[in-house]
């Protein structure tokens, strides 16, 4: 029976490259030169700046760098800014994997579409199986049109 997996993964090397590009862009910007920093540790980027508006500009720089590296900005979870001495800090978490709640929503969306496929949750991925390849392609089209709040990839397509 043909099947495929719905996953949400990040290429960690591309994320590292995107953060490095954001750091370089921060050094090039005249209005932000020497006023802010990016720190990247295990899918968490900590932004440090002197003012709130600088943090917002830094978030836009980070989003642009990620998009240039073909990483969807939907995976960003932006926390609230907080004061740390004279500086403002903000954490941006890069989300990866499909949690149980999102997996249930994906399965429900596939069932609502009334396609001739079955969806099953398997850890951090959703396996979709069907009798025909065309049914699976319809399921992929339905999931691409669905706004899940996370970037979804489709892999492990088997006949």
From Swiss-Prot:
Keyword Amino-acid biosynthesis: no
An annotated Gene Ontology molecular function: nucleotide binding
Assigned keywords, A-Z: Nucleotide-binding
Heme recorded as keyword: no
Pfam families: DUF520 (PF04461)
GO cellular component terms listed in the entry, alphabetical order: cytosol
Top-rank taxon, per record: Bacteria
Family that this chain belongs to: Belongs to the YajQ family.
Function: Nucleotide-binding protein.
Cross-referenced HAMAP family: YajQ
Protein name: Nucleotide-binding protein Psyr_4087
Gene source species: Pseudomonas syringae pv. syringae (strain B728a)
């Amino acid at each position: 029976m043909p099947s495929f997996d719905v996953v949400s993964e990040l290429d960690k090397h591309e994320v590292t490259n995107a953060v490095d590009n954001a750091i370089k862009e921060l050094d090039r910007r005249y209005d932000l030169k020497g006023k802010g920093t990016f720190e990247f540790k295990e899918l968490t980027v900590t932004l440090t700046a002197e003012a709130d508006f600088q943090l917002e500009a830094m978030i836009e720089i980070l989003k642009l760098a990620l998009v240039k590296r073909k990483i969807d900005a939907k995976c960003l979870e932006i926390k609230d800014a907080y004061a740390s001495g004279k500086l403002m800090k903000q954490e941006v978490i890069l989300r990866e994997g499909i949690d149980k709640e999102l997996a249930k929503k994906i399965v429900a969306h596939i069932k609502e579409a009334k396609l001739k496929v079955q969806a099953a949750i398997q850890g951090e991925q959703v396996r979709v199986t069907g009798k025909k390849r065309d049914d699976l392609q319809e399921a992929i089209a339905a999931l691409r049109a669905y706004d899940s709040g996370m970037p979804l990839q489709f892999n492990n397509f088997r006949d």
